[in-house]
Amino acid sequence: MFEAILSPFRWLMSWLLGAFHSILEFAGLPADSGWTWALSILLLVVLIRTLLIPLFVKQIKAQRAMQAIQPELQKLQAKYKGKKDQLSRQAMAMEQQALMKEHKANPFAACLPLLIQMPFFFALYQVLIGARGAAERGEAMDALSADQIRSFEGSTIFGARMSDTFMNSLGAPGSGPVIVTAIVLILLMSGSMFFMQKMLMTKNMTQQALSGPMMQTQQIMLYAMPLIFGIGGINLSLIHI
């Protein structure tokens, strides 16, 4: 089921990746360079993010609407403070929903861009992680030809193969470039993930709104996601980072 859903996304991601690589090759970049493949992936990610800008705008508007009704939500919480019976809890929930509907505030709108991105990036990850097996078999994969797969799998950055991982390189002879490159990439990606989300939160939310329960949960995720990515990154190949 999951594979059937991702299959068209994977084909699209592989086609776009190959198209960007061909464009960069036509522009004069070496076809087998790791930098050419890395730039192709970067352009693909930028394209997806650009297409999702309207959703990010909707997310910001939803956050501002939630910010605007925080005083009213706090009044409702004070009104029903200490009331634990089911009728009171239902009444509070209904009043909160009515307030959000009136002001067109949706606490779940912030999740929409993430949910839309997930199939695209899961598909891209499958393309990248499946390249090694396809290269070993000498096969094409989705929209990428066998030659493109071979070029992708054999490409290097700073002498480190794109398919190498931090953990698999520990203690191996000549693994210095892989380890250094992996650490730098993990720090850069974790840091950029943190600062981009932090900037989005502080720009669009007041301190009062940031102290609310929902925003406190988002702040936990703000620190947790880069940490999870950093820990998981040591097991990913360089191109997956």
Segment roles from a protein language model:
Residues 32-44, 181, 214-218:
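Membrane-interface starts of transmembrane alpha-helices
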Residues 1-40, 144-178:
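Interfacial loop/helix-cap signal at membrane boundaries in integral membrane proteins
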Residues 86-98, 102-110, 114-186:
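Non-cytosolic segments of integral membrane proteins
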Residues 50-121, 194-228:
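Membrane-interface amphipathic helices and adjacent TM-edge segments
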Residues 240-241:
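Conserved small/polar residues in nucleotide/adenosyl-binding loops
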Residues 39-51, 184-195, 224-231:
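Lipid-exposed faces of alpha-helical membrane segments in multi-pass integral membrane proteins
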